[in-house]
């Protein structure tokens, strides 16, 4: 208003949904559950140990999303499949400050970028600059959070929840890899 003298319309705010993302211990590999705010399990996630393949299953045990880690790449690379079809290839980008991954999909460019939060590791997921959601560490001081990867997913487009679930597991695995001393953007910048 100050610059133009014209009242600008408010941007419509899209409501978001919050989901919990909790790891369960399994000797056979990674296992996660995704629940809504009422505690209803929406998806289960099963992955191999070490994480090479990850499957997101709905309540009917149908595979709705799959992620596979591509071995032999200098920077982390993952292939994502939706309903058995290739959705895109997520590649870690060289960035001196924060983790950043991009993927070209039919809808445009998808980006997962670490952003500064007060505590913990937080990521935002955008598609062509539009916010799809965020992945935030569960910072409650519990034994489960100290041992397992637990997070909150804030989702603006519920149809993208399985994609965000895969990205949350991938981000958690990359953080664990960073802690184990792998060469990463963070170690290069020090």
Language model segments and positions:
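Low-complexity or membrane-interfacial segments used for flexible interactions
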Residues: 1-53, 59-62, 85, 92-190
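Hydrophobic/aromatic-rich structural module bridging two neighboring secondary-structure elements via a short loop
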Residues: 56-89
């Amino acid at each position: 208003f100050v610059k133009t003298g014209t009242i600008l319309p408010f941007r419509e705010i899209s409501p978001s949904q919050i989901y919990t993302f909790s790891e369960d211990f399994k000797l056979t590999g990674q296992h996660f559950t995704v629940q809504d705010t009422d505690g209803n399990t929406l998806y289960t996630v099963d992955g191999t140990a070490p994480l090479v393949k990850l499957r997101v299953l709905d309540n009917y045990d149908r595979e709705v999303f799959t992620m596979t880690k591509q071995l032999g790449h200098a920077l982390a690379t993952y292939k994502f499949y939706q309903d058995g079809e290739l959705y895109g290839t997520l590649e870690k980008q060289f960035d001196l400050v924060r983790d950043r991954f991009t993927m070209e999909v039919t809808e445009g460019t998808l980006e997962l970028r670490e952003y500064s939060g007060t505590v913990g590791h937080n990521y935002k997921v955008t598609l062509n600059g539009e916010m799809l959601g965020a992945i935030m560490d569960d910072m409650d001081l519990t034994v489960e959070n100290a041992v397992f990867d637990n997070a909150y997913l804030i989702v603006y487009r519920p149809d993208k929840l399985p994609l965000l679930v895969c990205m949350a597991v991938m981000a958690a695995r990359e953080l664990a890899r960073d802690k184990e001393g792998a060469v990463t953007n963070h170690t290069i910048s020090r």
